[in-house]
Amino acid sequence: FLSLIPHAINAISAIANHL
């Protein structure tokens, strides 16, 4: 589960950057 956290943060960051 901990290994998924950076991926989730990266996805959120990419979405925020797209907005």
Swiss-Prot record:
The keyword Nucleus does not apply. Transmembrane segments: none annotated. This is Phylloseptin-J3. It is found in: Secreted. It comes from Phasmahyla jandaia. Signal peptide: none annotated. GO terms for cellular component: extracellular region. Keywords: Amidation, Amphibian defense peptide, Antimicrobial, Secreted. Disulfide bonds: none annotated. Its main location: secreted. Has antimicrobial activity. Expressed by the skin glands.
